[in-house]
Amino acid sequence: MRIKSILALALVALAMTNCSPLNITSFNATSNGVEYKYEVIVPLTNFVRVTAITPADQLTGEVVIPSTVNYDGTNYVVSQIGKSAFEGYSGITEMTIPSTISVIEEKAFRNCTALREINTPQPLSTIGDYAFEGCSSLENYSLQASISKLGEGCFRNCMSLTNVTFPTSLNNIPAKAFEGCTALEEIYIDRNMLTIGSKAFFGCATVTDFTCLTPTPPTANSDTFEGMDANLPVTVPMANIEQYRTAIGWSYFANYQGQ
């Protein structure tokens, strides 16, 4: 009899464990009028990635992504924006991202054509492939000092983007990152850049102010700067001008000036 009682208690405990909120893998919840799907990133933790499921034609204007969400009595921390989370949501004009977000996954905001402003937090470390591709109304975007990884084509065809500054935390600009940014006027690269990928600034013909303070020319491809004005003044460290003049990719430019 005692064995049966112990077994019964064990089965109850197991059932309670299996129903624990931390065993949930995904759930839906609504915040500020927007319905989202939340997926637990690592099993048995309370960190989740968020994806919008409200239909795109019903979501317009400003969107504020929540930093936390409560489901079945458990608080979950929203730490990632999922793959294609808002892709094609062409009515969104402004996006506020909470300070809990560290990763924006691939194509998260792709073709959000009305998006003019994105407020992103300092802890953000990763922007995925093609995350903001085709955000043709986006005029300004500041890469925070916490950014350490950009994905391929992340700002491709952001045709209203006018300037970009790369923080010292970032060592690589990937292929096609700013390809087709036809309004881009200013590029500022700090001292720690190592590589700039194929077609990273392809077709950025409107750039008039280009500064790269990295002493050794970052590794580039022959097409990295293709389509830019070859005669625009490029500011580099005074002691390294000749290195830039002869480096692959950088030899595209004819007008170097020292700083």
Give the location of each predicted region:
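Short, conserved catalytic or adaptor-binding loops enriched in Gly and charged residues
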Residues: 224-228, 248-251
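Extracellular/surface-exposed low-complexity segments
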Residues: 5, 19-23, 233-259
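Structural signature of tandem-repeat unit edges
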Residues: 40-48, 58-80, 90-103, 112-126, ...
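Short, charged, surface-exposed secondary-structure boundary motifs
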Residues: 127-128, 220-221, 245-247
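Acidic, Ser/Thr
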Residues: 53-56, 69, 85-86
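Consensus positions within tandem repeat domains that build extended binding/scaffold surfaces
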Residues: 83-85, 105-108, 128-133, 151-156, ...
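Short beta-strand/loop segment at the start of cytosolic alpha/beta domains
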Residues: 24-55
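Bacterial Sec-dependent N-terminal signal peptides
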Residues: 2-34
